[in-house]
Amino acid sequence: MQLHDHMKYIDLGCKMACIPRYQWKGRPTERQFYASEQRIVFLLGTICQIFQITGVLIYWYCNGRLATETGTFVAQLSEMCSSFCLTFVGFCNVYAISTNRNQIETLLEELHQIYPRYRKNHYRCQHYFDMAMTIMRIEFLFYMILYVYYNSAPLWVLLWEHLHEEYDLSFKTQTNTWFPWKVHGSALGFGMAVLSITVGSFVGVGFSIVTQNLICLLTFQLKLHYDGISSQLVSLDCRRPGAHKELSILIAHHSRILQLGDQVNDIMNFVFGSSLVGATIAICMSSVSIMLLDLASAFKYASGLVAFVLYNFVICYMGTEVTLASGKVLPAAFYNNWYEGDLVYRRMLLILMMRATKPYMWKTYKLAPVSITTYMATLKFSYQMFTCVRSLK
C-alpha cells in the first residue's frame, strides 16, 4: 500500500473539476493528457461562477433592495447572501487549489517519500487508509447527490407547475441571478440560465470535492506519522544498542512532520479562512431563507444549509484530529524508560518532549484555530445573527 492508493476520490474530483490529476515523482501512473475539451469546460465553469457571483448581487440591487415590506426585504437579503456565499466559497476553492497546485504536488511527493515501507508494525497503515477512504467516499457521494438535487430542482418545480393548472410557470432558476437575456416566460432563456449555473456549479463542486478530500488525505497522513512516532517511542528501549540513533531519527522525523503540517496550513489558509467566514454567514442566512420563503425555496436552501454545516464541520474536525494525534507524542516520550538511559539519551528525549509540549494546531492565518471549538463558536455566532435578522420581520 502506497500514497497513490489513497487518490481514488481526489482523482474523481479532479476529473469533475476538469483539471489534471495530481502527479509526483514516484507515482506509477503517467500524467494523463489534458484534453482541450476539459480546458474549455474548466474555463467556462469558472466564468459562469464569476458571472453568477456578479449576477446575484445585480439581481438583489435591481429587485430585492426595492422591497417595501420589512419581511420581504429580509427574505430577499437572506436569499441573496446565502446564494452569494455558496458560489463565493466554491470560487475560493477554485482559486486556492489552482494557485497552489505546484505546492500540493510537492507536498504529496514528500509524503510519498516518507510513507512507511519498513517496520510497518509501528504504523497502522491499513487502519488509516480505511478511515480516510470511508470519509472521502461519503463526501464524494454527498456532494454528487447535492449537485444533482440542486440543479434539477428548477426543472422539477417547473414540471410541477406545468402539471397543475392553478399554478403559473415561475421560471425560477437555482438562484435569483440577473441574466442579460430574458428568462421569465422564455423556455430558451430559462434553459440557458439553468445550464450556465449547472456548468458553474459542476466545476465548483468538483473543486470542493478535491479540497475536502485533500484535507482528509493530508490529515490522516499526519495522523499516521504521529501515531507511528508515538508507537516507536513507547517501544524504544534505551538499554538496547543503537537506541541513541533510533531516537535521533525519531526526533528528525517528528521535526519533518511538523514542517509538513505547516506546509498544509500555508496551502489551505485561504480555504480555512473562506470556509470560516462563508459558513458563518451562509448558515445564518440560509436558516432565515428557510423560515421566510416558500416550500420549494426552503428545500433548496436547506440543502445549502446542510452543505455548509458539513463542509465547515469536516475542515474543523480534521484540524482537531491533527491536534489530538500530535498530542500523543509527549506522553509516549514520557512513558519511555528514559530513567534507565544515560545523560545524552535523556537530553535528546528532553528536546523532543519540549518540542511536543504544545500539541500542533492548524490556524487560519495564525488567528483562529481549525478545531471543533471554532466550529461550535461559528454555529453560536450564526445563531446569534439568525435571531437578530429574524427579529427584523
Curated annotation (Swiss-Prot):
Chief location = membrane
Q: One Pfam family of this protein, by short name? A: 7tm_6
Membrane topology recorded in Swiss-Prot or TrEMBL? Multi-pass membrane protein
Subcellular compartments: Cell membrane
Further information: The atypical heteromeric and topological design of the odorant receptors appears to be an insect-specific solution for odor recognition, making the OR/Orco complex an attractive target for the development of highly selective insect repellents to disrupt olfactory-mediated host-seeking behaviors of insect disease vectors. Odor-evoked OR currents are independent of known G-protein-coupled second messenger pathways.
Question: Quaternary arrangement and interactors, per the entry?
Answer: Interacts with Orco. Complexes exist early in the endomembrane system in olfactory sensory neurons (OSNs), coupling these complexes to the conserved ciliary trafficking pathway.
Q: What is this protein called?
A: Putative odorant receptor 69a, isoform A
